[in-house]
Amino acid sequence: MRPEEIDLPCFMAATQIFIIHGRGAYEAFRKMPTEHKYLQLVDRDYYPWPSNEATGKIIQFLDRYLRGIDYVNLERVGIQMRLGNREWYWRKEKDFPLPGTQYLKWYLRADNSLSRDREIELTEEFKYTTKAGPIGQKCGVSFHSSPFEENVEFAGHFSATLTISSSMPDADVVVTLWAIDEQDQIIPYGSKGEPEPIAKGFLRASHRKLDSVKSRPERPWHTHKQEDYAPLGQDDVVTVEVEIFPAAARVNQGWRLRLDIAPAEVQPDVLGYNPLAMRRFYGEEHEAGTNTVHVGPDRLGYITCPVVPLRQGYPNVML
Protein backbone atom coordinates (compact mmCIF):
# COMPACT_ATOMS: atom_id res chain seq x y z
CA MET A 1 0.00 0.00 0.00
CA ARG A 2 1.28 3.44 -0.94
CA PRO A 3 1.22 6.33 1.55
CA GLU A 4 -1.28 8.15 -0.64
CA GLU A 5 -3.79 5.35 0.04
CA ILE A 6 -3.55 5.41 3.85
CA ASP A 7 -6.38 7.27 5.58
CA LEU A 8 -5.99 5.84 9.09
CA PRO A 9 -4.45 7.65 12.07
CA CYS A 10 -0.70 7.12 12.00
CA PHE A 11 2.11 7.80 14.50
CA MET A 12 5.58 7.72 12.94
CA ALA A 13 9.14 8.10 14.15
CA ALA A 14 12.04 9.10 11.89
CA THR A 15 15.74 8.96 12.65
CA GLN A 16 17.88 11.99 11.98
CA ILE A 17 21.33 10.58 11.18
CA PHE A 18 20.87 6.85 10.71
CA ILE A 19 21.15 7.17 6.92
CA ILE A 20 18.28 5.60 4.97
CA HIS A 21 15.80 4.12 7.44
CA GLY A 22 14.18 7.39 8.50
CA ARG A 23 13.48 8.52 4.98
CA GLY A 24 10.28 6.47 4.66
CA ALA A 25 8.63 8.22 7.60
CA TYR A 26 9.36 11.68 6.19
CA GLU A 27 7.98 10.77 2.78
CA ALA A 28 4.95 8.97 4.22
CA PHE A 29 4.09 11.95 6.42
CA ARG A 30 4.20 14.28 3.42
CA LYS A 31 2.12 12.05 1.15
CA MET A 32 -0.53 10.66 3.50
CA PRO A 33 -3.89 12.43 2.90
CA THR A 34 -5.17 11.97 6.45
CA GLU A 35 -5.06 14.88 8.89
CA HIS A 36 -4.56 12.40 11.74
CA LYS A 37 -0.85 11.86 11.21
CA TYR A 38 1.97 12.51 13.65
CA LEU A 39 5.73 12.58 13.19
CA GLN A 40 8.54 12.41 15.74
CA LEU A 41 12.13 13.23 14.73
CA VAL A 42 14.36 11.29 17.09
CA ASP A 43 18.12 11.08 17.48
CA ARG A 44 20.46 8.73 15.63
CA ASP A 45 18.55 5.44 15.80
CA TYR A 46 15.46 3.73 17.13
CA TYR A 47 16.94 2.37 20.34
CA PRO A 48 16.37 5.46 22.56
CA TRP A 49 12.81 5.67 21.21
CA PRO A 50 11.09 3.57 23.97
CA SER A 51 11.72 6.24 26.61
CA ASN A 52 9.63 8.28 29.00
CA GLU A 53 9.16 11.00 26.39
CA ALA A 54 8.16 8.66 23.59
CA THR A 55 6.05 6.38 25.75
CA GLY A 56 3.96 9.31 26.92
CA LYS A 57 3.29 10.46 23.37
CA ILE A 58 2.38 6.98 22.18
CA ILE A 59 -0.07 6.61 25.08
CA GLN A 60 -1.60 9.98 24.23
CA PHE A 61 -2.01 8.89 20.60
CA LEU A 62 -3.65 5.60 21.60
CA ASP A 63 -5.90 7.35 24.12
CA ARG A 64 -7.12 9.69 21.43
CA TYR A 65 -7.84 7.16 18.71
CA LEU A 66 -8.71 4.02 20.68
CA ARG A 67 -10.39 5.46 23.77
CA GLY A 68 -11.80 8.70 22.40
CA ILE A 69 -10.06 10.95 24.93
CA ASP A 70 -9.98 14.33 23.21
CA TYR A 71 -8.42 16.48 25.90
CA VAL A 72 -4.88 15.33 25.12
CA ASN A 73 -2.82 18.01 23.37
CA LEU A 74 -0.51 15.87 21.23
CA GLU A 75 1.74 17.88 18.94
CA ARG A 76 1.56 16.93 15.28
CA VAL A 77 5.33 17.11 14.86
CA GLY A 78 7.81 16.63 17.68
CA ILE A 79 11.50 17.28 17.08
CA GLN A 80 14.43 16.27 19.23
CA MET A 81 16.48 19.42 18.69
CA ARG A 82 20.08 18.38 19.38
CA LEU A 83 22.21 21.00 21.08
CA GLY A 84 25.43 19.01 21.26
CA ASN A 85 27.42 17.79 24.24
CA ARG A 86 24.60 15.48 25.49
CA GLU A 87 22.00 18.27 25.46
CA TRP A 88 18.74 18.58 23.54
CA TYR A 89 15.18 19.80 23.89
CA TRP A 90 11.86 18.78 22.34
CA ARG A 91 10.40 21.21 19.86
CA LYS A 92 6.67 21.15 19.04
CA GLU A 93 5.56 21.99 15.49
CA LYS A 94 2.40 21.79 13.40
CA ASP A 95 3.87 20.48 10.15
CA PHE A 96 6.97 19.15 8.38
CA PRO A 97 8.86 20.73 6.73
CA LEU A 98 8.57 23.35 9.45
CA PRO A 99 6.63 26.53 8.67
CA GLY A 100 9.00 29.46 8.30
CA THR A 101 11.95 27.37 7.10
CA GLN A 102 14.54 29.31 5.12
CA TYR A 103 16.84 27.28 2.88
CA LEU A 104 20.14 29.15 3.06
CA LYS A 105 23.25 28.36 1.04
CA TRP A 106 26.84 28.22 2.27
CA TYR A 107 29.20 28.29 -0.73
CA LEU A 108 32.52 26.48 -1.18
CA ARG A 109 35.34 28.97 -1.67
CA ALA A 110 38.79 28.60 -3.21
CA ASP A 111 40.45 29.25 0.16
CA ASN A 112 38.80 26.18 1.75
CA SER A 113 36.16 28.31 3.43
CA LEU A 114 32.36 28.10 3.54
CA SER A 115 30.72 31.45 2.93
CA ARG A 116 27.28 32.93 2.40
CA ASP A 117 28.89 34.68 -0.58
CA ARG A 118 29.61 32.81 -3.79
CA GLU A 119 33.14 32.55 -5.21
CA ILE A 120 33.38 35.11 -8.03
CA GLU A 121 37.11 35.30 -8.79
CA LEU A 122 39.37 32.36 -7.97
CA THR A 123 39.29 28.75 -9.11
CA GLU A 124 40.71 25.78 -7.26
CA GLU A 125 40.80 22.00 -7.47
CA PHE A 126 40.77 20.05 -4.21
CA LYS A 127 42.10 16.54 -4.78
CA TYR A 128 41.98 13.61 -2.38
CA THR A 129 42.59 9.89 -2.52
CA THR A 130 39.60 7.58 -2.79
CA LYS A 131 40.92 5.38 0.01
CA ALA A 132 40.34 6.40 3.63
CA GLY A 133 43.50 6.66 5.71
CA PRO A 134 44.39 5.52 9.24
CA ILE A 135 43.03 6.89 12.51
CA GLY A 136 43.89 10.57 12.93
CA GLN A 137 44.29 11.27 9.21
CA LYS A 138 41.79 13.43 7.33
CA CYS A 139 39.57 11.65 4.81
CA GLY A 140 38.57 13.79 1.85
CA VAL A 141 38.52 17.60 1.95
CA SER A 142 36.98 20.01 4.47
CA PHE A 143 35.55 23.52 4.18
CA HIS A 144 35.02 25.78 7.23
CA SER A 145 32.64 28.67 7.80
CA SER A 146 33.38 31.75 9.86
CA PRO A 147 32.09 31.76 13.47
CA PHE A 148 28.34 32.19 13.76
CA GLU A 149 27.31 35.62 15.05
CA GLU A 150 24.20 34.22 16.73
CA ASN A 151 22.59 30.92 17.64
CA VAL A 152 21.05 29.17 14.63
CA GLU A 153 18.74 26.15 14.51
CA PHE A 154 18.53 23.76 11.58
CA ALA A 155 15.59 21.39 11.11
CA GLY A 156 14.62 19.63 7.90
CA HIS A 157 16.12 18.62 4.58
CA PHE A 158 19.71 19.51 3.70
CA SER A 159 21.36 19.07 0.30
CA ALA A 160 24.74 19.64 -1.33
CA THR A 161 25.42 20.74 -4.90
CA LEU A 162 28.99 19.92 -5.94
CA THR A 163 31.16 19.94 -9.05
CA ILE A 164 33.42 16.89 -9.12
CA SER A 165 35.60 14.65 -11.26
CA SER A 166 37.51 11.43 -10.67
CA SER A 167 40.34 9.37 -12.09
CA MET A 168 38.01 6.39 -11.64
CA PRO A 169 34.91 5.51 -13.68
CA ASP A 170 32.79 6.23 -10.61
CA ALA A 171 32.99 8.14 -7.34
CA ASP A 172 31.29 7.83 -3.98
CA VAL A 173 30.49 11.30 -2.65
CA VAL A 174 29.87 11.29 1.11
CA VAL A 175 28.91 14.67 2.58
CA THR A 176 29.04 15.24 6.34
CA LEU A 177 28.23 18.49 8.13
CA TRP A 178 29.79 19.10 11.55
CA ALA A 179 29.96 21.96 14.03
CA ILE A 180 33.23 22.90 15.70
CA ASP A 181 33.63 25.05 18.80
CA GLU A 182 35.93 27.97 19.60
CA GLN A 183 38.77 25.52 20.37
CA ASP A 184 38.34 23.78 16.98
CA GLN A 185 36.87 20.70 18.66
CA ILE A 186 34.11 18.68 17.02
CA ILE A 187 30.73 19.15 18.73
CA PRO A 188 29.29 15.68 19.48
CA TYR A 189 25.60 15.66 18.58
CA GLY A 190 24.85 12.12 19.77
CA SER A 191 22.44 12.08 22.72
CA LYS A 192 24.89 10.03 24.77
CA GLY A 193 27.83 12.26 23.93
CA GLU A 194 29.13 10.18 21.03
CA PRO A 195 30.61 12.06 18.05
CA GLU A 196 27.84 12.46 15.50
CA PRO A 197 27.49 15.16 12.84
CA ILE A 198 24.70 17.63 12.29
CA ALA A 199 23.69 15.81 9.11
CA LYS A 200 25.06 13.53 6.40
CA GLY A 201 24.22 12.08 3.01
CA PHE A 202 25.85 10.34 0.10
CA LEU A 203 25.57 9.67 -3.62
CA ARG A 204 27.34 7.49 -6.15
CA ALA A 205 28.22 9.79 -9.05
CA SER A 206 26.99 7.36 -11.70
CA HIS A 207 23.51 7.63 -10.10
CA ARG A 208 23.38 11.44 -10.35
CA LYS A 209 20.38 11.57 -12.72
CA LEU A 210 17.54 13.50 -11.05
CA ASP A 211 13.85 12.68 -11.20
CA SER A 212 12.38 16.02 -12.23
CA VAL A 213 8.90 15.08 -10.97
CA LYS A 214 9.82 13.72 -7.53
CA SER A 215 12.58 16.21 -6.76
CA ARG A 216 11.59 19.14 -4.58
CA PRO A 217 13.40 22.45 -4.02
CA GLU A 218 14.61 21.23 -0.61
CA ARG A 219 15.20 17.59 -1.52
CA PRO A 220 16.75 16.10 -4.70
CA TRP A 221 15.39 12.73 -5.82
CA HIS A 222 17.48 10.42 -7.99
CA THR A 223 16.04 7.91 -10.43
CA HIS A 224 18.48 5.03 -9.69
CA LYS A 225 17.41 3.41 -12.96
CA GLN A 226 19.63 1.25 -15.14
CA GLU A 227 18.96 3.40 -18.20
CA ASP A 228 20.16 6.49 -16.30
CA TYR A 229 23.44 4.92 -15.18
CA ALA A 230 26.18 7.42 -16.12
CA PRO A 231 29.79 6.41 -15.35
CA LEU A 232 32.45 9.10 -15.34
CA GLY A 233 34.86 9.63 -18.20
CA GLN A 234 38.54 10.35 -17.56
CA ASP A 235 38.16 14.12 -18.01
CA ASP A 236 34.48 14.49 -17.11
CA VAL A 237 33.61 17.31 -14.71
CA VAL A 238 30.03 16.88 -13.55
CA THR A 239 27.57 18.44 -11.12
CA VAL A 240 26.00 16.21 -8.50
CA GLU A 241 23.06 16.95 -6.21
CA VAL A 242 23.56 15.05 -2.95
CA GLU A 243 20.55 14.38 -0.76
CA ILE A 244 21.39 14.94 2.90
CA PHE A 245 18.82 13.32 5.12
CA PRO A 246 16.68 15.49 7.44
CA ALA A 247 18.12 16.39 10.82
CA ALA A 248 17.74 18.96 13.59
CA ALA A 249 20.52 20.70 15.51
CA ARG A 250 21.47 24.05 16.97
CA VAL A 251 24.77 25.77 16.19
CA ASN A 252 25.72 28.22 18.93
CA GLN A 253 27.18 31.67 18.55
CA GLY A 254 30.94 31.38 18.07
CA TRP A 255 30.79 27.88 16.58
CA ARG A 256 31.65 27.16 12.95
CA LEU A 257 30.43 24.74 10.32
CA ARG A 258 32.79 22.13 8.90
CA LEU A 259 31.70 20.48 5.66
CA ASP A 260 33.48 17.23 4.77
CA ILE A 261 33.39 15.84 1.24
CA ALA A 262 34.87 12.37 1.34
CA PRO A 263 35.02 9.06 -0.56
CA ALA A 264 33.85 7.03 2.43
CA GLU A 265 31.51 7.13 5.42
CA VAL A 266 34.38 7.20 7.90
CA GLN A 267 36.26 10.27 9.11
CA PRO A 268 39.44 9.03 10.85
CA ASP A 269 40.35 12.45 12.26
CA VAL A 270 37.14 12.45 14.37
CA LEU A 271 38.10 10.04 17.13
CA GLY A 272 35.33 7.68 18.19
CA TYR A 273 33.20 8.24 15.10
CA ASN A 274 32.13 4.82 13.82
CA PRO A 275 29.40 5.17 11.19
CA LEU A 276 27.73 2.30 9.41
CA ALA A 277 29.62 1.59 6.18
CA MET A 278 26.73 1.53 3.71
CA ARG A 279 28.89 0.91 0.62
CA ARG A 280 29.96 -2.47 1.95
CA PHE A 281 26.47 -3.72 1.23
CA TYR A 282 27.20 -3.32 -2.48
CA GLY A 283 30.84 -4.41 -2.65
CA GLU A 284 31.73 -1.68 -5.14
CA GLU A 285 34.15 0.55 -3.27
CA HIS A 286 36.42 2.70 -5.44
CA GLU A 287 39.71 2.83 -3.57
CA ALA A 288 42.45 3.14 -6.15
CA GLY A 289 42.18 6.65 -7.51
CA THR A 290 41.78 10.37 -6.93
CA ASN A 291 38.63 12.46 -6.65
CA THR A 292 38.52 16.22 -7.23
CA VAL A 293 36.15 18.91 -5.98
CA HIS A 294 36.13 21.89 -8.35
CA VAL A 295 35.50 25.39 -6.96
CA GLY A 296 35.19 28.60 -8.96
CA PRO A 297 32.84 31.18 -10.46
CA ASP A 298 31.54 28.69 -13.05
CA ARG A 299 31.60 25.64 -10.74
CA LEU A 300 28.53 25.05 -8.60
CA GLY A 301 29.45 24.24 -5.02
CA TYR A 302 27.32 24.83 -1.94
CA ILE A 303 25.41 23.20 0.89
CA THR A 304 21.80 24.19 1.49
CA CYS A 305 20.70 24.19 5.13
CA PRO A 306 17.15 24.46 6.58
CA VAL A 307 17.27 27.41 8.99
CA VAL A 308 14.19 27.59 11.22
CA PRO A 309 13.01 30.28 13.65
CA LEU A 310 14.93 30.00 16.91
CA ARG A 311 12.73 28.57 19.62
CA GLN A 312 13.06 26.94 23.01
CA GLY A 313 10.96 23.84 23.55
CA TYR A 314 10.32 21.98 26.76
CA PRO A 315 12.92 20.12 28.87
CA ASN A 316 13.95 16.67 27.76
CA VAL A 317 12.63 13.82 29.89
CA MET A 318 14.22 10.96 28.00
CA LEU A 319 16.26 8.47 30.00
Language-model-detected regions and their locations in the chain:
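Acidic beta-to-alpha connecting loop that harbors the catalytic carboxylate
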Residues: Q16-F18, R44-D45, A264
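Conserved alpha/beta-hydrolase "acid-adjacent" motif
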Residues: I19-G24
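Glycine/threonine-rich phosphate-binding loop and adjacent beta-strand/alpha-helix elements that clamp
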Residues: A54-G56, L66-L319
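Short beta-strand/loop motif that positions the catalytic acidic residue
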Residues: I6, M12-A14
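Active-site-proximal helices and loops of the catalytic beta/alpha 8
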Residues: Q40, N52-T55
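Amphipathic alpha-helical segments in well-structured domains
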Residues: A25, A54-I59
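Catalytic histidine neighborhood in serine/cysteine hydrolases
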Residues: M32-Y47
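Accessory cap/linker subdomain of secreted extracellular hydrolases
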Residues: M1-E5
